From Swiss-Prot:
Protein name: tRNA-specific 2-thiouridylase MnmA
Active site (UniProt): 113, 210
Protein family according to the UniProt entry: Belongs to the MnmA/TRMU family.
Interaction with tRNA as annotated region, ranges: 160-162
Cellular compartments per GO CC: cytoplasm
Gene: mnmA
Organism: Afipia carboxidovorans (strain ATCC 49405 / DSM 1227 / KCTC 32145 / OM5) (Oligotropha carboxidovorans)
Amino acid sequence: MLNSLDLEGPPSSTRVVVAMSGGVDSSTTAALLKAEGYDVIGITLQLYDHGEATHRKGACCAGQDIHDARDVAERIGIPHYVLDYESRFRESVIDRFAESYALGETPVPCIECNRSVKFRDLLTTAQELGAQALATGHYVASRRQPDGSRAMVCAADADRDQSYFLFATTQDQLNHLRFPLGDMTKAQTRELARRFDLPVAEKHDSQDICFVPTGRYTDVIERMRPNAMLPGDIVDLRGRVLGHHQGIANFTVGQRRGIGIAASMPLYVVALDAASRQVIVGPRAALRKNLITLRDINWIGDGTFDDVAREGRDLYIKVRSTRPPQPAHLRMNGDHCEVELFAGEEGVSPGQACVFYDAPTGQARVLGGGFITHASNNSDRAGTHHLALRAAI
């Protein structure tokens, strides 16, 4: 007989490791599982130097958070351990974050953290401790499939859904992960935290980017990849120089404010060319793209990705976490994966994720996704756009 986590055996004989960040979500997850009778162990990861971030409001995984996680564990009566993952986090997340900006991309470090640190290394640690599952406080859900595997679905609370940041979870990882808050709203989570008398019940939610102590991500990039802060030209779609900038890392595709160019119409950042250190600007209409090329595909839907991509498939995609899924068609074009958006999308930037869903609303199933390398329009293949723009997008 399966317990509430879809595992064999009673809760009392089921060990679960909970990733405790010190926030209300993971703390409530631990308290809920403990109340249900599971053998719960709390683990908090020390991911970076907490000196400057310890007292910054909204920081995640900072020094105070470690103390909060320890206090919660003591309150609910579970063992709690702090693991030093700073070197792993720097290599897997911070270094890649800085390098991505240096290449003119807009990275999403939370995805890499979930994939490479929390769900890979921490899951291994949980299994070494004899745990049958690793539980987190993410707002996403999973469902048991007829063959015993797990399917990831969007959270019941659409405003809190974090599936965009979890698309890179592998099928093997997903089979061992549990998300107890996936069918709850944030309000329900806080109410549970109050009911459990948790000291973090009213704590503010964490904000990205956790490892930027000052809140200025360019400080990290300037220190680690100074070439990304070298000056260059701001040009229009025809290549005409309109002005100058102090580093491409200060810009992202879709940006309007802070360009520093006076023009008769609003100008937006349309592309970044790291090789020439050019920031390419244009009207808003130039932001809309309907063809996206992807790398590093992760597929967690039915069947294999090779079969799906070879035959082509209609699905729904997100290119930003705050946007609703848009209808699109997935296919292979030669040796690379393409997604064609039926209605197009604005501000598609290399480095961001393109996440696949099987439905546009509700608790849609997450099918996987990939990272964006290029965004264009079908007409670009005919050479109708400025060469520098085509090379950069």
